[in-house]
Amino acid sequence: MEKVLVFGHKNPDTDAICSAIAYAELKKELGMNAEPVRLGEISGETQFALDSFKVEGPRFVETVANEVDNVILVDHNERQQSANDIESVRVLEVIDHHRIANFETSDPIYYRCEPVGCTATILNKMYKENGVTIRKEVAGLMLSAIISDSLLFKSPTCTEQDVAAARELAEIAGVDADSYGLEMLKAGADLSGKTMEQLISLDAKEFQMGNAKVEIAQVNAVDTNDVLVHQAELEKVITTVVEEKGLDLFLFVVTDILTNDSVGLAIGKATNVVEKAYNVTLQNNTATLKGVVSRKKQIVPVLTETFQA
């Protein structure tokens, strides 16, 4: 039987990795030869989840057409966030919870996108719909994905469905969602030993906003100053990325997991859009973004609307 690769976006977060593993397992149970893979490095937060439930991380690939003809996308749909040669393979399915942009296929596909906080929440439903029992280890990874995407249920993207799914999965996994979740987020917020290049690419996504090319990277921290003490070095590597990719804006968002506020560091010719979008004045290229924790709900749509205005 021909193999199908299942993967999340480049610079994968916990949902991208864990949902790839969980969905590949479901597809295997349903008779498909599916393998989860990843398009980038595994973060400290995700590694904590994998170690906690004793699951091996998926192997890394840069291209997919050299291995398979068919793929399944989880936690993304936009071409620029996917495998480098995504145009050379057939996308069989997409399971996602983001905006739909820069995506089209030549054949009809199974496309499931729901306005929930996490792909794993959708997968929890799909396991039930197919009558497949979720293994303890996989339930733990799916729980980890929901905790990560919802910032332990504090993000405005978090829905009642996400919370309910997390409670169900925690029971299967045999952990307390809140205490485990805090440990996992703290592991993800430990940025010691990371280079500046790693910091700005740990969780970075590229977007087309009107005519503008924008990259938004986000890291979680227990104290934003722990990251911003390196601002001069960060600006240097961000400027290099802006020049290499021809970006109009690079927004580096440092989110405090305790206060649920963020600080944005903006570089590029379109930094004025950040000021306009959030009614702030950038001082030394930074501004506090009160109550902003979600790239998907509080940054991407706000900036897109401002760019298109």
Swiss-Prot record:
Binding sites annotated in the UniProt record for Mn(2+) 1: H9, D13, D75
Any one GO cellular component localisation term in the record: cytoplasm
Catalytic activity: diphosphate + H2O = 2 phosphate + H(+)
Cystine residue pairs: none
Domain of life: Bacteria
E.C. no: 3.6.1.1
Keyword presence, Hydrolase: yes
Main enzyme class: hydrolase
Amino acids binding Mn(2+) 2: D15, D75, H97, D149
Protein keywords: Cytoplasm, Hydrolase, Manganese, Metal-binding
Principal place of residence: cytoplasm
MF term (GO), any: inorganic diphosphate phosphatase activity
Bound cofactor: record note: Binds 2 manganese ions per subunit.
Gene3D superfamilies (UniProt xref): DHHA2 domain, inorganic pyrophosphatase (n-terminal core)
Pfam families: DHH, DHHA2
Compartment annotation: Cytoplasm
Co-factor requirement: Mn(2+)
Family note: Belongs to the PPase class C family.
Protein name: Probable manganese-dependent inorganic pyrophosphatase
Taxonomic lineage: Bacteria, Bacillati, Bacillota, Bacilli, Bacillales
